A protein has these predicted regions:
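Short catalytic helix/loop segments, enriched in acidic residues and glycine
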Residues: 7-25
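A generic structural motif
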Residues: 26-32
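Short beta->alpha junction loops
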Residues: 32-40
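Short, glycine-/small-residue-rich phosphate/pyrophosphate-handling segment
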Residues: 32-33, 83, 92-130
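Short, well-structured alpha-helical segments in soluble
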Residues: 44-53
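Mid-chain, well-packed structural core segment of small domains
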Residues: 53-91
Length: 130
């Protein structure tokens, strides 16, 4: 629902449109996009072999980031570098967003940079390619 939900926080650009731009910026990366509002679907996706052994994983856990130990455990199984992205500055928002249970599992976290956080994450992963 990016582009429709709370545009004052998340912006007005649909993620699918931004994804096209990311694919243009990083043609050497095979960018695969998965989104679900269901915790179990996210866990099942992360546990797939092609994800666990991917070159890198960028995750925005949304509100799951603040309480889903199950997703954190699934991320621990991923052998690829993990980067967490949050579009908004979660530390400038509600108290419950001050805790992030996914961050300790990730190599890096990009918070509050808008959609550009995804570009920064992919640039980091791209720079590791030999």
């Amino acid at each position: 629902l990016l582009g429709a939900r709370e545009p004052e926080i998340y912006g007005a650009t649909a993620f699918e449109d931004y994804l096209d731009r990311l694919r243009e910026l990083f043609p050497s990366l095979d960018i695969v996009y998965f989104q679900s509002n269901h915790e179990g679907d996210l866990i099942d996706y992360l546990q797939q072999d092609e994800v666990r052994h991917a070159y890198g994983v960028v995750i925005n856990g949304g509100a799951f980031s603040h309480y889903s130990y199950a997703i954190a455990d699934a991320l621990r199984m991923v052998e690829a570098p993990l980067i967490e992205v949050h579009i908004s500055n979660t530390y400038a928002r509600e108290d419950f967003r001050q805790r992030d249970v996914l961050a300790p599992v990730c190599e890096g976290v990009i918070i509050g940079m808008g959609l550009d956080g995804y570009r920064l994450a992919l640039a980091n992963l791209s720079s590791r390619r030999v």
